[in-house]
């Protein structure tokens, strides 16, 4: 079982490197290829577009294959997409490479979660999914700084060549360590959409989107916030980014550790509440260096503490369409990144100081918590109504 979790964690590490590694090489990429930095920044959006487009397509048309074969196909797409990006010299080919790299992202998380739900004891699934997600958090802590170093010392192409080669190793681990099992719950194409008739998955999608949007409304502007509000120097940003990366790792670990004692719903709702409080503290107390570091750490820890319980809630409420539901969660996550960055930017467009980005951030996180509370209320009502419906008439 540990080898399966390790294999999936290696996969999410590679995805994390591909998704976020671009942020540390934009200047070198723009200079080398002869495009503007804003145009190079489009490569972030193309990856997100690949996630949004690829996840449902792969989820819908993969029902005839085993979960292991789907994983192998997804990792192969990672190799191809990152290799294309590495070898490209035109804007068009760079964009295509990023699109292909993003296609497998959402489906990989979904298939991985389904695999773990089938081989792990019910009470341990959330912890196992947290183990899978840990690869993404470690990528933020260690992988991305390594990629930035390679770009600065050699070339940005070395960063993405490393990602492509690493994913070949991931393919080998999937081939040897992941059991060849099928998702017998999958029905025909129409049946996979049946779960969307219930409000439950939509509330989880909303919680996922608003939760990520809340953190990203602030985190998208973390550098100017820390420099102009908290008073840190630019050289301190490397330490700060490693600190928040450590928060992501520890938040995910803590979520998995307590999953045996608390339900996924309780973990997610309480985490969103803590994030709301942390964001409000970042608004009011951002001028105090130590305080801003503490609550920045808490916000980023909370972001990844949400990942595993929300993934489990989606699987529980997507019967017959588990892969589509999990992929939809990744779409909601990426949509939240865009919504959050836009909402935070609105405060700056109005001419307000950088600490004001924490206000829409807190509001979005409160919306995430509210979505989860509404979900809990709906499930309680559903449970209360079931015995009544079961009684014979007359």
Swiss-Prot record:
GO terms, molecular function: transmembrane transporter activity
Primary site of residence: membrane
Sequence ranges on the Cytoplasmic membrane side: 1-4, 64-69, 117-128, 179-198, 256-261, 317-322, 375-394
Superkingdom of source: Bacteria
GO process annotations (BP): transmembrane transport
Annotated membrane topology: Multi-pass membrane protein
Subcellular location(s) of the protein: Cell inner membrane
CC terms in the record's Gene Ontology section: plasma membrane
Induction, as annotated: Induced by arabinose. Transcription is dependent on the transcription factor AraC, the cAMP receptor protein (CRP) and cAMP.
InterPro entries, per database record: MFS, MFS_dom, MFS_Efflux_Transporters, MFS_trans_sf
Membrane topology, Periplasmic segments: 28-41, 90-93, 152-155, 222-235, 285-293, 343-351
Observed phenotype of the null mutant: No visible effect on arabinose uptake or growth on arabinose.
Membrane-spanning residues: 5-27, 42-63, 70-89, 94-116, 129-151, 156-178, 199-221, 236-255, 262-284, 294-316, 323-342, 352-374
Position of the signal peptide: none
Keywords: Cell inner membrane, Cell membrane, Membrane, Transmembrane, Transmembrane helix, Transport
Pfam families, per database record: MFS_1
Function: May be involved in either the transport or processing of arabinose polymers.
Family: Belongs to the major facilitator superfamily.
The protein's name in its UniProt record: Putative transporter AraJ
Species this chain originates from: Escherichia coli (strain K12)
